[in-house]
Amino acid sequence: MPLRGVIIAVVAAALTVPSAPAAAEGHVETFVAFDPAAGEFPEGIAVDKRGNVYVSLIPANQICRIAPSGAQSVVAEFDAPGLGPAGLAVNAKGTIYVAVSSLNLATRETDPATRGVYRVLEDGTSERLPGTGAMLFPNDVTLDKRGNVYATDTSRGAVWRISPRGSAEVWADHPLLKGSGAFGFGFPIGANGIALRHNTIIVANTERGLLVALPIEPDGSAGAPTVLAESPALVGTDGIALDVHGNIYAGIGVQNKIIRIDGDGSIVILATAEDGLNQPSTVAFGTGRSERKTLFVANFSLLSPAPTPAVLKLPVGEPGQPKP
């Protein structure tokens, strides 16, 4: 997910990224606004089956639940040093899974004592899943129907799988998941946003502008990866979400864009800074009857000289894929 140093390092490069076709799918509106003075910058976002929106807030290091009415409540807090909770997902039972990086921006190191993937129960208690402290940079998560959690390890350039039994292992480690180091952050920024489509894991490689597909084999192992899309217009891609047709939606904070990548690899711009985007990090589809065709956007804005941290709503004309 977007990082302070990453954004600084790639702003200049982002300004030279070729434009993609624009599409006026809907009007961007603010769902809820946060307080930058309180460290409330939304990084990750997820929506449960009841239509509640969950966001990770850094450096406040909280997870906030937003009811369909807009009412907010803190459901979890983390003692992680530096930047804590990042990408998150919610299962059908309302259990939250979140990647906690514990990134110290001064040293550019993560804290092995607190980093990992955490499970947050409805009562607000949380526990680190066994073995995930070995991850170098936990960043985003997705879930399958079997209860497996898949998590990106950004600096290592890998995907981990945590089984329902709690065992964590490196599931996929491939050059296509590795960052190039081009952002100059001190370590590569590779595998980042992650989503599941049927029996395929889709991963965004931030520095290299790639979307990579990893099939889940019948025995549960990772199959050979393939490139779904590759373009300078994808450099900086962060969190991703899919609609019912398999089109991929992504937040690109360094470009102030929300884009859609169609099945043929074509890229369409859905919203820009002119629509109120301010370093958007990631996106998630609504689940309520009136919100299934709405994309909820984490308007991160951590580095903006005029920060406007918020959750935005963007109608996109297609419903999100059903949750596992």
PLM features: residue spans?
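Beta-propeller fold detector
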Residues: 29-33, 73-79, 127-131, 169-176, ...
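Hydrophobic alpha-helical segments and helix pairs
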Residues: 116-172
